[in-house]
């Protein structure tokens, strides 16, 4: 079985900064003697995680794979600019091309708790749609929160995760 992993820096581990040692996902893979494919990238949005996971499973065999996905914070976005995807989050902008700096500044000013709750509700549905897609592909999977749960989405209003989401 292949352990497919995606998420933000929590799923990537110390390697994001050129560190040494093993991430927790590497420990999981080692413990169960599994090969691993880790598509995690620091500061990833749910959009990037879903996009790259679907690309991976569309272009590679899904036979005998298990997906482990860690979700970051809900305000994060992915912007496509000149055929390059950029991870966007509050306070993280130095990697952006100059032509995106003004857009980023406007975006950052709009980020408050009410916008976070709104995005949390949107992402809740996007992640559930991805969960259903993985089920259609017959790919077993587990999702977990790296940062926090779905803010503003009451437990009784959350969709049925079929025991695939640890929140």
Where would I find each of the regions flagged by the language model?
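Alpha-helical cap/lid subdomain in secreted, periplasmic
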Residues: 54-167
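Short, glycine/acidic-rich beta->alpha junctions
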Residues: 20, 49, 122, 126
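Outer-membrane beta-barrel proteins
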Residues: 46-52, 56
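Serine-esterase "nucleophile elbow" of acetyl-processing enzymes
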Residues: 1-48
